[in-house]
Regions:
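Aromatic- and glycine-enriched pocket-lining scaffold segments that form the walls
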Residues: 81-126, 133-146
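Outer membrane beta-barrel
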Residues: 9-69, 74-106, 226-240, 395-410
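Transmembrane beta-strand segments of Gram-negative outer membrane beta-barrel proteins
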Residues: 1-2, 32, 60, 153-155, ...
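Outer-membrane beta-barrel proteins
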Residues: 3-18, 72-78, 131-134, 206-208, ...
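Surface-exposed loop/turn segments flanking beta-strands in extracellular/periplasmic regions
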Residues: 53-65, 110-127, 420-424
């Protein structure tokens, strides 16, 4: 496989170049990959997809990760790929993984040539960003052993050692006091998965070279009427896992977070599902958003009712309370966010799917009483969209969406996941007043060749324009096109 990608504003059409050669045995158990690859093992503390799994409408699935082992790297995140050789070998109750990698990473350098920080956005649009490209070399060697002594029990251990050149400098600021520094990082972890009837016990614990640790453990129960999961997590402030992306509130590498998550799914009658989750979390050390310890909680209630064979109605309410730092007052202000979503899914035939969604959110800042009258603290936003997916032929399908949005400001912005070309995940942010439309086409030209294309346009104005400027000056029109040609042999 070969993947070339260029972000908007970048000069080179092949700013990102990825390639791989993959071999699978007839049993599909033994694998060998040369080139770019990734690993998804255990609960993701050491290796996982860069996108991970975030909380959503399903309260069970995101909290219990399924091991996908060794995979070709076919996504466009520019900082999560390993490049070299990797193999997966199975022998009865044992599985062995061996991997080597030599990759170039983006980084900002100090005047003395040491690494100031890792640059992870992947953008190389100007000289400043280009000067960060491929400044850091990482050599990595590691392995994994998985044993299944009995059919319902698996035990695993994962380890790797990476060497960086140049070295990462020690930083004095409180925010970066526990950031990675030095030339070498090592991780070793243990994981388990035990299934007994309807119950599943699972977890993973890992330690980095500087004795920072991460631990994740949970229990899952599944039945026809009720499923529930309880998951605890704790990631120390000095835990360094650059390829890890386990369950967390931050959605980043597991570090500086602890919390407990509980999720339920009930099916009281055939056509009705009720889904609930609650998550309480805290960040014991300052983060880049808040220069002091902070905490929060969120909950979701969702009901899905199948009105007819082809018509599904869903209602979702989500509440989130998180600490926010106000630089003007230099204090933490609690922020409440409430979101209500109503959705209809209609599938008149196996070829056509329609979706209509209405969504509204409310934002409230809990300022001290003396400040409430002086500063706005309530904001709202609303979104409406119509979505259609049409399969005109087994090898050809079209997806299109028309979206209207109206938000008070950036604080009340809304997001929507969109269909995109394979390997890309789009969670589009919308603020102001306007529309966003797109069309995506996927065409399997031959068994070994496929074409994907997406065209999108956004037209918007700010809700509170500057009186000194006209709407024409404030108008935003953004057009984008993504094209991907994929071949397999």
């Amino acid at each position: 496989g070969l993947l070339l990608e260029k972000d908007s504003g970048e000069r080179r059409l092949d700013d990102l170049r990825l390639y791989f050669l993959s071999y699978r045995s007839h049993s599909n158990q033994n694998r060998l990959i040369l080139g770019n690859y990734r690993l998804e093992v255990a609960q993701g503390l050491i290796f996982n997809s860069p996108y991970g799994y975030s909380k959503g409408s399903d309260p069970i699935f995101p909290a219990r990760q399924r091991e996908r082992a060794l995979l070709e790297y076919t996504i466009v995140d520019e900082n999560a790929s390993l490049c070299g050789v990797a193999g997966q070998f199975c022998f009865k109750i044992y599985q062995f993984f061996l991997f080597l990698s030599n990759t170039q990473r983006d980084a900002s350098l100090n005047d003395d040539g040491t690494v100031k920080n890792f640059y992870t956005s992947g953008y190389h649009r100007n000289d400043l960003e280009m000067n960060k490209k491929d400044k850091l070399n990482e050599r990595l060697i590691g392995g994994r052993v998985l044993i299944k002594p009995i059919p319902n029990l698996s035990l695993g251990t994962t380890f790797y050692r990476s060497i960086f050149d140049p070295v990462a400098a020690i930083q004095d600021e409180d925010l970066h006091r526990f950031s990675f520094a030095g030339k070498t990082n090592e991780l070793i972890g243990l994981d388990y998965n035990f299934i007994h009837r309807q119950f599943n016990l699972f977890g993973e614990i890992a330690r980095s070279r500087n004795n920072g640790f991460g631990v994740l453990s949970g229990v899952l129960m599944e039945s026809k009427l009720l499923s529930f999961i309880v998951l605890g997590r704790r990631y120390s402030k000095d835990f360094h896992s650059f390829y890890g992306n386990s369950f967390s509130e931050s959605g980043d590498n597991p570090q500086n977070e602890s919390g407990i998550y509980t999720g339920f799914q009930l099916k009281p009658i055939n056509n009705l599902k009720i889904k609930i989750y609650f998550d309480q979390f805290e960040f014991p050390w300052p983060t880049y958003r808040i220069p002091m310890p902070s905490s929060g909680k969120d909950m979701l209630f969702r009901t899905e009712y199948k009105l007819t064979k082809n018509l599904l109605f869903s209602l979702q309410y989500k509440f989130e309370q998180k600490d926010q730092f106000n630089s003007l007052f230099e204090q933490v202000i609690p922020r409440d966010k409430r979101n209500l979503r109503i959705q209809l899914d209609f599938q008149p035939s196996s070829l056509l799917r329609l979706r209509c969604r209405g969504e509204k959110n409310w934002i409230k800042y809990h300022y001290p009483q003396l400040l409430k009258s002086r500063y706005p603290h309530n904001f709202q936003g609303v979104l409406l969209y119509q979505d259609a997916s049409l399969t005109m032929h087994p090898n050809f399908d079209i997806a299109a969406r028309l979206t209207f949005f109206d938000t008070d400001n950036y604080e009340s912005r809304l997001y929507q996941f969109e269909h995109d070309i394979p390997g890309m995940l789009t969670n589009q942010m919308l603020d102001g007043i306007g529309t966003r439309n797109y069309i995506r086409i996927q065409w399997s030209i031959k068994n070994f060749l496929s074409l994907s294309l997406k065209y999108a346009t956004t037209h918007s104005y700010p809700n509170f324009p500057d009186e000194r400027r006209s709407y024409r000056d404030l108008e935003k029109r953004i057009h984008s096109i993504n094209v991907q040609l994929e071949t397999n042999w």
